[in-house]
């Protein structure tokens, strides 16, 4: 999938059909009810479940209240512009609770952990691990064989469209609770220490830490051994 630029994302959101899907459990004299053709029904006897758009389901429930004894509605979004990514055929490990929007690219053998939030237009390279509760903003790009530590935020940019998103090159390790501001590029093989706030580009093969992040040293063997990427965790 080719990465979308900001204007393409804005157009996608503007022109998408906004959705308020609902799931309704209902019981009553359901055999007397004619269900709308654009509502999916799973009815057995006097009880069942229906799925549909609230704009269709709401008047349906009102019109048939004489034959509906009771119902419960489940709803988790309102006028949503972007569906979630269809993950069934993604060649990666994606754990429960990750929220990944459509138009996201995920490479082979990547790992997306619980609670991660991946916004539209983001790119995650082959073998990269996105740890728990990480946020990748719109169009944020992470290269191959990286580790983005738990709770970190890589700023993405959709608005204003002139701003640039974060780019993380290959073989980068980002510690926990790091914030990388928009427009920053982290060079190949760099290490960002936990808790850092990265406000400017990071040179390849360097170690940075602090608020704001500053270069501490060039990557040495000791640091490399402590930040090793384990391929065993990426096997499917």
Curated annotation (Swiss-Prot):
The keyword Acyltransferase applies. It catalyses: (S)-2,3,4,5-tetrahydrodipicolinate + acetyl-CoA + H2O = L-2-acetamido-6-oxoheptanedioate + CoA. GO terms for molecular function: tetrahydrodipicolinate N-acetyltransferase activity. The keyword Ion transport does not apply. It comes from the Bacteria. GO terms for biological process: diaminopimelate biosynthetic process; lysine biosynthetic process via diaminopimelate. Its EC number is 2.3.1.89. Pathway: Amino-acid biosynthesis; L-lysine biosynthesis via DAP pathway; LL-2,6-diaminopimelate from (S)-tetrahydrodipicolinate (acetylase route): step 1/3. Keywords: Acyltransferase, Amino-acid biosynthesis, Diaminopimelate biosynthesis, Lysine biosynthesis, Repeat, Transferase. Pfam families: DapH_N, Hexapep, Hexapep_2. Signal peptide: none annotated. HAMAP family: DapH (MF_01691). NCBIfam families: DapD_Ac. Catalyzes the transfer of an acetyl group from acetyl-CoA to tetrahydrodipicolinate. Belongs to the transferase hexapeptide repeat family. DapH subfamily. This is 2,3,4,5-tetrahydropyridine-2,6-dicarboxylate N-acetyltransferase. It comes from Listeria monocytogenes serotype 4b (strain CLIP80459). The gene is dapH.
């Amino acid at each position: 999938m080719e990465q979308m630029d900001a204007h393409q994302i804005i157009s996608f959101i503007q022109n998408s059909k906004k959705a308020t899907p609902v799931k309704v459990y209902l019981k009553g004299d359901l055999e007397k009810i004619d269900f709308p053709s654009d509502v999916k029904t799973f009815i057995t006897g006097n009880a069942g479940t229906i799925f549909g758009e609230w704009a269709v389901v709401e008047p349906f429930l009102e019109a048939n209240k004489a034959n509906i004894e009771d119902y419960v509605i489940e709803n988790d979004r309102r006028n949503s512009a972007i569906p979630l990514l269809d993950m069934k055929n993604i060649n990666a490990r994606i754990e429960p609770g990750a929220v990944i929007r459509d138009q996201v690219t995920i490479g082979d053998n990547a790992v997306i952990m619980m609670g991660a939030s991946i916004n539209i237009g983001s790119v995650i390279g082959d073998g990269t691990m996105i740890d728990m509760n990480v946020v990748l903003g719109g169009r944020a790009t992470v290269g191959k064989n990286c580790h983005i530590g738990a709770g970190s935020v890589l700023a993405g940019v959709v608005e204003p469209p002139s701003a640039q998103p974060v780019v993380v090159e290959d073989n980068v390790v980002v510690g926990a609770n790091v914030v990388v501001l928009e427009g920053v590029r982290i060079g190949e093989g760099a290490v960002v220490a936990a808790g850092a706030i990265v406000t400017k580009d990071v040179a390849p093969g360097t170690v940075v830490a602090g608020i704001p992040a500053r270069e501490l040293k060039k990557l040495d063997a000791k640091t490399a051994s402590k930040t090793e990427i384990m391929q065993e965790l990426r096997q499917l």
